[in-house]
Amino acid sequence: INWLKLGKAVIDAL
């Protein structure tokens, strides 16, 4: 799992 991409996706969803 790519945590940086996942984190960016979460931030973009906010």
From Swiss-Prot:
Modified residue annotations for Leucine amide: 14
Membrane-spanning intervals of the chain: none
Organism annotation: Protopolybia exigua
Gene Ontology CC entries for this record: extracellular region; membrane; other organism cell membrane
The protein's name in its UniProt record: Protopolybia-mastoparan-III
Tree of life domain: Eukaryota
Annotated family: Belongs to the MCD family. Mastoparan subfamily.
InterPro entries named in the record: Mastoparan_peptide
